[in-house]
Amino acid sequence: MNTCIQLLILCLVTVINSENLTDISTETTIENEIENATETELSEAIEKETENVTETELPDTVKTEIQFETQNLPHNPKQKYCRTEGQYCSRTYFHRCCGNLVCQLHGFFNGTCVQCLAERKFCIWSSECCSKRCRLFRCRKNPYVQVIPY
């Protein structure tokens, strides 16, 4: 047991030392290149790099990444491991829906996160149903809400 721990520590120290050595070698290489380059060479290199990037290229990339990341974030910061709308859920602590989303079950502990439950879907609380009326574990029509056709 002690031998395994010692080997593990030795491996970790070796990995950390090798990472530090590569960092130091790249830093010295960069310093040498900077010393050898003149100001005009540096300004020309910067101009060439900026010419290669178009104005529309950066905002689209950043915009896409931000939209993708915000879709994966939970609605409530206290809920770290929750599912967003349309993702798999099971009505358990491990696979729960974020915020006000509800898990609509399709089978035994197999469902999808939705805004609210439709009529005749399995429910526990009235707040889970779109009609706000849960009776005998099913969402029911709300007699007080009238739908007026156009």
From Swiss-Prot:
Entry keyword Secreted: yes
InterPro entries: UPF0506 (IPR021712)
Keyword Nucleotide-binding listed: no
Record's subcellular location: Secreted
Glycosylation sites: N20, N36, N52, N110
Signal peptide segment: 1-18
Domain of life of the organism encoding this protein: Eukaryota
SS bonds (residue pairs): C116-C130, C123-C134, C129-C139
Cellular component GO terms held in the UniProt record: extracellular region
Pfam families: UPF0506
Entry keywords, A to Z: Disulfide bond, Glycoprotein, Knottin, Secreted, Signal
Homology family: Belongs to the UPF0506 family.
Entry text on domains: The presence of a 'disulfide through disulfide knot' structurally defines this protein as a knottin.
Name listed for the protein in its UniProt record: UPF0506 protein SJCHGC03144
Species of provenance: Schistosoma japonicum
